[in-house]
Design a protein with these regions (language model features):
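Conserved N-terminal structural segment that caps and organizes enzyme catalytic cores in eukaryotes
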Residues: 1-133, 138-210
């Protein structure tokens, strides 16, 4: 069976209750973000809303000198990355620091760090050229620097395997909440223990309809 992207999106969304589908709304999700690139401008460390994936394209002719260097940390290392951030930021650390998009990390420093158990953080580098796409994985942390003048467009995506991946990020943040005494407040990492994410709970049970 061959499906268009619109049909596939419709089928996948229909697997989620309307109450939960209504949560997955926002700029970059139902409509793309558009960014102006300048040489040396940076995009800070972040994970996508709801731990979604993200498709990013540079809007420029193939022969132009519009490039971007990306760095990424896979979701299975996010706990170690937070350990690194707690050591580096000290009292300035917050559990939501990756969602606030205010931090730009030296990738060499992150890659060279080792945890108390001797664990390392995997840091990957990607060079994106004009008209090329970069797709980020669910819950990955990414940042980078623009190397030319142009435009970049980005839109989030999620396929059926997103739910399990986002649940894993949620469990990591539960550990962080316990270790730090802080509570997450941004929507990038959903609290799947909340009733509003419970697929077996009706809208009336959480105080209204959507």
């Amino acid at each position: 069976k061959v499906m268009s992207s619109k049909t596939r999106e419709s089928d996948e969304q229909s697997n989620l209750p309307q109450r939960i589908r209504s949560l997955l709304w926002g700029a970059g999700i139902i409509s793309p973000w558009l960014y102006l690139m300048n040489p040396g401008s940076v995009f800070c460390c972040h994970i996508e809303d709801y731990a979604f994936g993200s498709a990013n394209v540079i809007i420029a002719p193939p022969g132009s000198h519009t490039w971007a260097a990306w760095y990424s940390v896979p979701r299975h290392d996010i706990g170690y990355l937070h350990e690194y951030l707690r050591e580096m930021l000290g009292d300035e650390y917050t559990i939501d620091c990756l969602e606030q998009r205010k931090i730009w990390l030296d990738p060499a420093s992150v890659s060279a760090w080792t945890s108390k158990e001797g664990k390392r953080i995997h840091v990957y580098r990607h060079l994106q050229g004009p008209s090329e796409y970069i797709a980020t994985d669910y819950g990955s942390v990414h940042w980078g620097v623009n190397l030319g003048i142009g435009w970049k467009a980005a839109v989030n995506f999620a396929f059926p395997d997103w739910w399990e991946a986002a649940q894993g990020i949620h469990l990591e943040y539960k550990k962080l909440e316990k270790a730090t005494g802080q509570k997450r407040s941004y929507r990038s990492v959903p609290d799947f223990d909340s009733k509003k994410w419970d697929t077996t709970t009706s809208a009336d049970e959480i105080g209204g309809t959507c």
